[in-house]
């Protein structure tokens, strides 16, 4: 019985490359001369540091541009609150979303059931497993999900026959 998984996870290699490129551009830009602006990456989160709110916005702008160039969907990013650190400096923690959330998983399963396509959807941890009897049905489910789900970047993997 053919099946596949619907997942929501960023390519962490591309995220790392985007962070490195952003830091390189920030270090060479004239408007950041003498400032301590940078982006750091730790496991599932990024931290943007800058001298003030305006420069923090500039740092995030550079990061988003580099991520877009590396084909990393910016919907993976979840921005935290801007925190003040020593003196005037500020930082912001940006979390990278991983996995299909419970609400989104339920919505995907409901959409699959409402579509009347002869497939079954089940939530398995942070992924949704879709299985059916025909490959064509699975392909039509993929097309439907790509068209209708816009709040999260979905990937389809683990195809089995």
Swiss-Prot record:
CDD domains: YajQ_like. It comes from the Bacteria. It holds the Pfam family DUF520. Keywords: Nucleotide-binding. Belongs to the YajQ family. HAMAP family: YajQ (MF_00632). This is Nucleotide-binding protein Reut_A2760.
